Amino acid sequence: MKRILSIQSHVVFGCAGNSAAVFPMRRMGMEVWPINTVQFSNHTQYQQGWKGIAMPAGHISELVDGLSAIEATQVCDAVLSGYLGSAAQGQEIVTAVNKIKQDNPNAIYFCDPVMGHPEKGCIVAPEVETFFKESALSSADIIAPNLLELESLTGMTINTLDQVIEANNQLLEKGVKMVVVKHLSRAGIQKDRFEMLLTTEDGSYHVSRPLYDFDAKRQPVGAGDLISGVMLANLMAGYSPIDAFERTNAAVDSVMQETFNRGAYELQLIASQERFNAPEIIVKAEKVA
């Protein structure tokens, strides 16, 4: 059994951050240790607003110190990070990653650099964006940006698939071993599909799934967090990057289809749980570079 430390946001109601990623990873056989960067009543796209707080400075470090004291850091196989409440939390995560890799040299760091949405813009403070560009990249083994986040990480303006591939290769040159672009958006080649791109030293692979016609004001939140969690769990289960990519695409499609069919605003993880371990792979990844 693989052990994953998951450091990201938490919502009491609904599915975002750890609330979107922890259950699927556990359902896939992972032992998951969640640490919350913020704790909100619900995700922030509700028109009625939300309540909650960012965890205080030192919170992450204190908990990781506790894990170290009981020697849990020695058996941690991966760290997954997502939404940050502050840049200081990011530095605490990097410190935690370094400690875990020191205790277990085989551990990996999967960074989901949550900054915003290609159609909605950046939602984090400038110092958080700077942290991802200047600190997270040097520590991450795997990074999973959307198009907006990829532009931020590379400083490129990206409008085509070739430019996405160029940007991904730029990240590989900085030491990242795998890039998973969770949403190609306008840079995609199939405007009626939801497209993703995987890049490793072996090349770049494109995959897509149906783009469901959710109401613009009722677009489910948390799909990116779900993608990162399921992708990491598949990799930890021993699947190759390409197989993990295909399985993740299929599993997430099942969740989105179930959510759409039920007319729900929150991801229907419970109703879709059988597909996390047994995804119906209809679309195979295609090598594009």
UniProtKB/Swiss-Prot annotation:
GO terms for molecular function: ATP binding; magnesium ion binding; pyridoxal kinase activity. Pathway: Cofactor metabolism; pyridoxal 5'-phosphate salvage; pyridoxal 5'-phosphate from pyridoxal: step 1/1. Keywords: ATP-binding, Kinase, Magnesium, Nucleotide-binding, Transferase. Its EC number is 2.7.1.35. It is an enzyme of class 2 (transferase). InterPro entries: PM/HMP-P_kinase-1, PyrdxlKinase, Pyridoxal_kinase_PdxY, Ribokinase-like. SUPFAM superfamilies: Ribokinase-like. GO terms for biological process: pyridoxal 5'-phosphate salvage. GO terms for cellular component: cytosol. The keyword Cell membrane does not apply. ATP binds at residues 112, 144, 149, 182. Its cofactor is Mg(2+). Substrate binds at residues 9, 44-45, 225. It catalyses: pyridoxal + ATP = pyridoxal 5'-phosphate + ADP + H(+). Homodimer. Pyridoxal kinase involved in the salvage pathway of pyridoxal 5'-phosphate (PLP). Catalyzes the phosphorylation of pyridoxal to PLP. Belongs to the pyridoxine kinase family. PdxY subfamily. This is Pyridoxal kinase PdxY. It comes from Aliivibrio fischeri (strain ATCC 700601 / ES114). The gene is pdxY.
